[in-house]
Amino acid sequence: MASSMRSLFTDHSRYVESFRRFLSNSTEHQCMQEFMDKKLPGIIARIGDIKSEIKILSIGGGAGEIDLQILSKVQAQYPGVHIINEVVEPSAEQITKYKELVAKTSNLENIKFAWHKETSSEYQNRMMEKKELQRWDFIHMIQMLYYVKDIPATLKFFHSLLATNAKILIIIVSGASSWQKLWEKYGSRLPRNDLCQYVTSSDLTQMLDKLGIKYEYYDLLSTMDISDCFIDGNENGDLLWDFLTETCNFNTTAPPDLKAEIMKDLQKPEFSIKKEGKVLFNNSLSFIVVEA
């Protein structure tokens, strides 16, 4: 590995920008929206039974776009019921964006929001110091378990916080996606970091099975348009390269042979499909619903 290569997580602003480019070039949020519309109402059908208020915990809530979709479904299921929505999010920038989104969104009068600038581990430690743990009716962890050091312990802890009829929704890249193939083949040749680990739904279901925790599992197709990655000097492509490889300025710091290998693989059918002149990377998502 060339010494000039460094993890994308060493440059927070570059990471945030590459993540935004990923979202704008992928069907990630559309895929989540489809799940929220078609599956979520059935999943939350009993979480608020005989309750005067519903407590929701968002772990890694980001800028809040998906959180507000979830809240709208809960409101529709339990009209007029008071909702407490607490958000655990380590990025101050994301919390600011979340608050801005709430401020300009209507029909949130029956929801009380609270934000905690901390990681899930910091939240866990803070709660463990308290004598009485808060119980939750719905906990969701959207695309955040990659940033947890001890995933089984995290799953076990948050499962212990579930109230009667409560559920946890976990969204993570599918074991059938191209991310797993990319990580398995090239992970050892890309910069190491302590902040993120390669984990997919395949790993997660094994962990849940080992813990004896019951869950339901759904897979939905999502794609990322990586066509710009094959255009020299394209800024959008450069940022997508960074996101794909979790490497800061991958295009200018990666050894030419490594870049050529990955570029060749990304165009193969096992990684991407070619449609209407676009190269679409398999970004399929898994939705895992954990029961109390």
Swiss-Prot record:
Described purpose of this protein according to its UniProt entry: Inactivates histamine by N-methylation. Plays an important role in degrading histamine and in regulating the airway response to histamine.
Cysteines engaged in disulfide bonds, as pairs: none
Top class in the EC scheme: transferase
Summary of subunit composition and partner proteins: Monomer.
Positions annotated to bind substrate: 28, 283
Source organism superkingdom: Eukaryota
One GO CC annotation: cytoplasm
Keywords, in A-Z order: Cytoplasm, Methyltransferase, S-adenosyl-L-methionine, Transferase
Coiled-coil residue spans: none
Binding site for S-adenosyl-L-methionine: 60, 89, 94, 120, 142
Pfam name, any one: Methyltransf_23
Subcellular localization, as worded in the UniProt entry: Cytoplasm
GO biological process, any: methylation
Protein family (similarity comment): Belongs to the class I-like SAM-binding methyltransferase superfamily. HNMT family.
Main location per the UniProt record: cytoplasm
Organism: Bos taurus
Reaction(s) catalysed (UniProt annotation): histamine + S-adenosyl-L-methionine = N(tau)-methylhistamine + S-adenosyl-L-homocysteine + H(+)
GO molecular function per UniProt: histamine N-methyltransferase activity
UniProt-recorded name of the protein: Histamine N-methyltransferase
Catalytic activity, EC: 2.1.1.8
